[in-house]
Amino acid sequence: MAGAPGGGELGPAAGEPLLQRPDSGQGSPEPPAHGKPQQGFLSSLFTRDQSCPLMLQKTLDTNPYVKLLLDAMKHSGCAVNRGRHFSCEVCDGNVSGGFDASTSQIVLCENNIRNQAHMGRVVTHELIHAFDHCRAHVHWFTNIRHLACSEIRAASLSGDCSLVNELFRLRFGLKQHHQIETSCVSRPAMNSQSCLGLVSA
C-alpha cells in the first residue's frame, strides 16, 4: 500500500528512505497449516515474541537474497534499518507479511511464519516490493500495471513459487511446473488488485 487512500501521497521525512508496500497486507500469503502445528524442542523454548525477531535477525544476517536486496537498496539511496523498517505482529487470516505504508514498515506476521525458511521467503518478497518502490517510484494505487508487475516479480524472485512450495500447497504437476508457476506468480497480482477494488476476482 502506498500513501494514504483517497489522498495524495506524502513524501518521506527528510533523509528517510522510501519504502512502500503495494498490496494492502495481502503479501506473501501461505496456505493454512492443517491441524495443530508441531513444535520442535528448540522452538518450544521461545515464545512467538522471541522467535520472530530472532528469525528476522538470522534472515538479515545470513540469507543471500536478503543481503543482496539490502545492499541494492542501500546503493539506491534507500537504506533499510532493522529497528525502523521491520515489525513482528499478530495478523488475521493466513497472511504472512505485508507492508504498512502508514509506518513505512514491513510487517511480519509472527503467528503465521512457521520456520526460518518461510521467514526468508517473506522478507525477500517484501524487500522486492520495497526495492521496486525505491528504484522505480511505483504508483501503487493509480497504476495497476505497477502493482501487478511488482507482485509478479516478488512472487517469482522470492521463491514463493518454487516447485517445492507448490507441492506443499498441494498443486502437483512435475511436467507442468512451468504452467503451475505461471499461475502462482499471477495469483498475488490478482489478489492485490482485487483488494484495492481495481479488478473483480
From Swiss-Prot:
Active site: residue positions: E126
Keywords: Hydrolase, Metal-binding, Metalloprotease, Protease
InterPro entries per UniProt: Peptidase_M76_ATP23 (IPR019165)
Subunit field text: Interacts with XRCC6.
Any GO molecular function: metalloendopeptidase activity
Region (Disordered): 1-40
Record field: compositional bias (Gly residues): 1-10
EC number: 3.4.24.-
Family assignment from sequence similarity: Belongs to the peptidase M76 family.
Binding site for a divalent metal cation: H125, H129
Protein name in UniProt: Mitochondrial inner membrane protease ATP23 homolog
GO biological process terms, semicolon-separated: proteolysis
